[in-house]
Amino acid sequence: METVAVKANKPAEYKRPFLSPLNQRRWQNFKANRRGYWSLWVFLTLFVLSLFAEFLANDRPILVWFKGSIHAPVIFDYPEELWLGEDGFLPVTDYKITEIEQAFSQHGWALWPPVRYSYRTVNNELPEPAPSAPSWLYSKEQRCQAYTLGVDDPGCNLGNWNWLGTDDQARDVLARAIYGFRISVLFGLILTLLSAVIGVTAGAGQGYFGGWTDLLFQRFIEIWSSLPVLYILLIIAAILPPGFWILLGIMLLFTWVGFVGVVRAEFLRARNFEYVNAARALGVGNRAIIYRHLLPNAMVATLTFLPFILNGSITTLTSLDFLGLGLPPGSASLGELLAQGKNNLQAPWLGITVFVVLSMMLSLLIFVGEAVRDAFDPRKTFG
């Protein structure tokens, strides 16, 4: 009985909240901006779905049940011999041919993605020369005229539709838009995060130490910022082969500068505050003062810029791809699709698709950025 009484009178253990009271108020301010809050969820949903683009748009089935065994062509390569026996000779199966589809229907089943085209799949059964209009704009006879058996061909079905048409190389526009969305957001996120790390570190060093350190770095940044980025890209593109990481590295050389000024100003303002002098008097090292005491306050201004920097990074990649200075030819690129729309004005579905994807993506990021700015506004947090 005494043990039960002791346990009953024992005070509950304190559990530290996940967010501090200040950050809880900021989160409530962010949620109060309904447009920005729901824009964040919509953007995250679209981004997470795009990470699984191979399961949404692919010229391979997701799963195949064939003669009592299950296979995952979306992940693994299988030879044609597995499905066609001695009649198969290709080391990697082309799942769009009629014989493969007939083998699946006779000996099992195949689970296909919603879009049966990858970003690089060429559709050879178009009703007219590429770029062709969305399939739902044609009659059944027009859609099936390029197939061997016409309207009776099993390949002429709803699953092989090009819902948003094809580009000038007979590739599915919807598939390229899905993959292009993913690569644009990934490029922007990586570039923004790396730029923030470098820019915040440089700005913190300048603002905290001041003196000659600040003076020399400021002169270097002034010279570095005056370099013509476009001409440097032209020169490097002529020397090095185009690639995702090469382009990211080139852009990173110049993007980090945008973070330095804000962080530097915050450190210059706060480095002589009383709590910083008290930490020095207690023997706290410079690194601990920078990262534990000054950086959290300086990051408030930096975080409000991140959605807009991400927005600018995506726009920059699209612009470079539009000019032919971005990703390698054939990559899933919104800028390359936009250039095709400019060169094929008779195919308005190309430009309209890119316009809708870009305007939606950039608008969502702007709404999120406005909500983040309101969340960190001291007048709303402490008012």
Residue ranges and their predicted role:
Residues 166-383:
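Alpha-helical transmembrane segments of integral membrane proteins
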